[in-house]
């Protein structure tokens, strides 16, 4: 996957071992064909016959000779989006909270999670070369011989190859930041509002002093210390920095023993957010500012009166020029800065992803890395013939004539946290994965994006305003009580609600919420969210289905949905529970998948889409007689558990993905549910264990191109990417 402005191609990476979480041990050739499907034709369905009662190990397995998915489809090209690398030998980690840079340009990172185990990756020359295993948190520092990273309530010393030593530095709480020379290590203790200076060789505390809300820290060549003050950072998944404009953030100047010195840096404005500081090769101070400017400032004259000498990056960051359009010098989510002995500058960015960039002393990008699709699904702009792809916050343009890995160009970043600070994508991602799966729709000539998450508790609505996805509306099944108790502001005290951006500013304001008359919550154990081509929203599936017909658009071009217009629809036979649906408006065909009395729900497999898929023709006429009924692959006794989690419908085919089956796709004909075959990811991503579980209910999407090819995308959380298949029937 390439960037909007490709830099030089990095040389081949070093050979390295890989640590992975939750890997299943089976070979590349062990494609899953167990759990075959059984189709019941229309004649049986019209006679009132339900799908035959089977068990996962019994009749389903025996039915393979009659309705087999053993055929491995070979005319499939595998590619991916969301990560610079495929995951075959290297990948860009899920998150980054801070960086430190050695004199020779090795970038040490730290974070709180990476699905494949690289919480604290080490990068050099545009490649992942190692990891400091066991580190977890916000602080990282380096000197000429060691790295120092957050572990628990302090720091642990690592060798530069990533090996932990027994030497620790007791901060007393998870440190906010750290800096190091060959003789000293400095850490900031945000819980106790203090700075600590340690002897680098022994871990003994040499000095400590008070700083209000300390953040990042740097040590000048003179040994003097610069500390960001009056800044706080969330401890939840968002890890965002905050300042109080009534008490603006400042960078304070101290002697090595903690005596206050002149030269306080107040920044270019009271709104600045100095998230990170570092000293460059010239002895000047680099400051990562994630306020409205979103730039990296350089301050000179540290021995006297510091002065702002220059700023790297366009003022306004990702909001500059064409808002959202990607350029190497347009920043967002700045969390780390650093410099090497040659004067190069390194910038790390985080808004639920990892972006690392290296710039020459003249400000030209040298290389850049991206990992921005951890537990992300993707969808196609329906008007683009599969060329334009969107995840919840990134937009890619595809060139299918190019080789996998070079066919995707990162076109835009659709989230602007400065213009829309209440955007739900800033509050619903992280470990809860409450914003993960987008649905793209063209309505009234405009592009809209609907987003749900792993637990389907809500549906977010965005209107594409150029390259920015502007918050437009939302439907929540109940009051939201997330990590941030202040979000969303003004929501009702209890019950389900619909929000619409009446003012057009993207903020959740009083008077913009509506509720049903009884103030009730919607049943929580419901997994259906579907937006059809008319813009109608389908929801529910527990005891009934609920349809929200699109009521038009308001003056802000927001789609209008109301409780008054909502329709309740009984579940059709043979279902007792519906977990997913797809309504083809043009063909008037409804597909539903779920459980029946003969194929009941199993709480051990709560995320799955169900065992039974049914097609109903002429749905709008009230017909609920199945055209056909299909028993989906389901084998919980096999070495690799086979259960379906997500389906996609395009052209003449139905596509499905399982949870533990790692990017494998099953294919049936939509007309009669006859089996076509299956495929797994190609060697471009490595062996089959180099792809991960499909962790979200809506983790697969598909479209048919004008040339007859089919494109299928599958969420792949293990190595922070989205799989993209191109299949020629």
Show where each model-derived region lies.
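Residue-level detector of Asp-centered blade-edge/turn motifs that repeat once per structural unit
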Residues: 101-104, 142-144, 180-182, 219-222, ...
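Short, conserved, GDST-rich strand-edge loop motifs in beta-rich repeat architectures
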Residues: 230-246, 460, 480-488, 594-610
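Beta-strand-rich domains and repeat architectures in extracellular enzymes and scaffolds
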Residues: 86-116
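Blade-level signature of beta-propeller repeat domains, shared across WD40, Kelch, NHL, RCC1
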Residues: 697-729
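Conserved beta-propeller blade signature
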Residues: 107-108, 146-149, 185-186, 225-226, ...
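Surface-exposed loop and turn segments in beta-propeller and other repeat-based domains
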Residues: 77-88, 263-270, 309-329, 410-430, ...
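N-terminal secretory signal peptides
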Residues: 1-22, 29-45
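Repeated scaffold domains used in trafficking and secretory/extracellular systems
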Residues: 95-98, 135-142, 173-178, 213-217, ...
């Amino acid at each position: 996957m390439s960037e909007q402005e490709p830099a030089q191609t990095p040389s081949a990476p070093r050979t390295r071992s890989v640590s992975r979480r939750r890997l299943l041990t089976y070979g590349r050739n062990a494609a899953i064909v167990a759990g075959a499907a059984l189709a019941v034709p229309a004649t049986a369905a019209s006679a009132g016959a339900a799908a035959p009662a089977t068990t996962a190990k019994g009749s389903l397995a025996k039915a393979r000779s009659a309705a087999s998915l053993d055929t491995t489809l070979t005319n499939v090209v595998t590619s991916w989006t969301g990560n610079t690398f495929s995951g075959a030998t290297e990948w860009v980690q899920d998150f980054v909270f801070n960086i430190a840079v050695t004199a020779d340009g090795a970038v040490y990172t730290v974070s709180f999670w990476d699905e494949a185990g690289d919480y604290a990756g080490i990068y050099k020359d545009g490649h992942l070369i190692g990891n400091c295993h066991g580190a977890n948190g916000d602080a990282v520092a380096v000197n000429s011989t060691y790295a120092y990273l957050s572990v628990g309530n302090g720091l642990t010393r690592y060798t530069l190859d990533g090996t932990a030593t027994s030497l620790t530095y007791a901060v007393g709480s998870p440190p906010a930041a750290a800096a190091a020379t060959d003789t000293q290590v400095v850490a900031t203790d945000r819980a106790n509002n203090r700075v600590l200076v340690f002897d680098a060789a022994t871990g003994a505390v040499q000095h400590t002093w008070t700083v209000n809300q300390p953040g990042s820290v740097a040590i000048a060549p003179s040994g003097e210390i610069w500390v960001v003050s009056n800044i706080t950072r969330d401890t939840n998944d968002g890890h965002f920095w905050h300042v109080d404009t009534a008490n603006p953030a400042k960078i304070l100047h101290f002697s090595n023993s903690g005596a206050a010195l002149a030269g306080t840096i107040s920044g270019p404005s009271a709104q600045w957010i100095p998230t990170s500081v570092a000293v460059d090769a010239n002895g000047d101070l680099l400051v990562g500012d994630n306020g409205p400017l979103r730039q990296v400032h350089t301050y000179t004259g540290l021995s006297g009166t510091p002065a702002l000498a220059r700023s790297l990056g366009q003022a306004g960051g990702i909001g500059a020029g064409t808002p959202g359009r990607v350029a190497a010098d347009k920043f967002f989510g700045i969390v780390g800065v650093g410099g090497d002995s040659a004067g190069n500058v390194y910038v790390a960015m985080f808004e639920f992803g990892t972006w690392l960039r290296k710039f020459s002393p003249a400000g030209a990008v040298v290389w850049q890395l991206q990992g921005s699709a951890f537990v992300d699904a993707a969808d196609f702009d329906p008007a683009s013939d599969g060329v334009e792809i969107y995840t919840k916050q990134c937009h890619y343009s595809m060139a299918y004539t190019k080789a996998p890995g070079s066919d995707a160009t990162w076109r835009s970043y659709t989230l602007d946290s400065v213009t829309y600070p209440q955007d739900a994508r800033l509050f619903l991602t992280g470990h809860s994965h409450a914003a993960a799966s987008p649905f793209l729709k063209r309505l009234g000539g405009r592009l809209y994006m609907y987003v749900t998450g792993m637990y389907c508790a809500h549906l977010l609505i965005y209107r594409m305003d150029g390259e920015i996805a502007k918050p437009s509306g939302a439907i929540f099944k109940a009051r939201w009580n997330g990590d941030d108790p202040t979000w969303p502001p003004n929501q009702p005290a209890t019950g389900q609600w619909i929000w619409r951006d009446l003012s057009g500013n993207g903020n959740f304001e009083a008077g913009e919420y509506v509720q049903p008359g009884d103030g009730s919550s919607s049943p929580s154990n419901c997994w259906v969210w579907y937006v059809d081509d008319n813009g109608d929203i389908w929801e529910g599936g527990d005891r009934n289905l609920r349809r929200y017909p699109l009521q038009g658009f308001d003056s802000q071009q927001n789609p209008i949905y109301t409780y008054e217009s909502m329709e309740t629809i009984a579940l059709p036979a043979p279902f007792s529970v519906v977990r997913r649906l797809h309504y083809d408006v043009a063909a008037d065909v409804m597909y539903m998948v779920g459980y029946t009395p003969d194929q009941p729900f199993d709480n051990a497999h709560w995320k799955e889409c169900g065992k039974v898929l049914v097609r109903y023709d002429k749905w709008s006429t009230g017909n609920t007689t199945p055209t056909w009924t299909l028993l989906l692959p389901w084998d919980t006794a096999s070495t690799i558990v086979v259960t379906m989690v997500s389906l996609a419908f395009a052209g003449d085919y139905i596509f499905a993905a399982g949870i533990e089956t790692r990017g494998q796709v099953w294919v049936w004909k939509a007309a009669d549910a006859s089996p076509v075959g299956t495929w797994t990811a190609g060697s471009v991503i490595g062996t089959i264990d180099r792809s991960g579980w499909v962790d979200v209910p809506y983790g697969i999407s598909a479209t048919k191109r004008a040339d007859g090819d089919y494109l299928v995308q599958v969420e792949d959380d293990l190595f922070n990417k989205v799989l993209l298949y191109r299949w020629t029937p």
